[in-house]
Amino acid sequence: MKKIVIADAGPVIALARIGQLSLLPRLFGKVLLTDLVASELTDGGVFADTAVLQKAFAADWLEIIKTSDQDLLQCRDWVNLHQIDMGEASALILATTHAALGDDVLIVLDDARGRQAAQHARLKALGTAGLLILAKNAKMIVEVKPLLMALQAEHYFLSERLLKAVLQLANEK
């Protein structure tokens, strides 16, 4: 059984914005993105972090997977059913495909509806905050709180309830 990690755009953008994109390969080695997610990250140079993301695309730890025509049709169904975007749908479909092959799959996404869809599909899901806890537990970062505050400073929404729960899990105040 292979360990497969698939990421959606949200956590990749969040980590890039706070200078912690390197946590993904340090925690997981190779990370898969669908071509739809990759397009969300780079098309039009919308994000200030596009240069950082382009560098990541050139690295060997990030692998872009082309979404098949059949999967694109399935994506539209997932978009309608779960009210998620095409990138999230493509990542979830890639994850379910690998899970059906018997792989140990983790999908990294932040969107609440996307996480509900992952749960519905019986996939293991982890968000940016969970990644930061893993990184702290692996002694890759010292504290989670300053990074959560940096995310908020970058206009990344974190509910008060989530902040409290994450800080408690990280043994921080």
Regions found by a protein language model. Give the residues of each.
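Short, low-complexity, intrinsically disordered N-terminal peptides in bacterial proteins
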Residues: M1-K2, K173
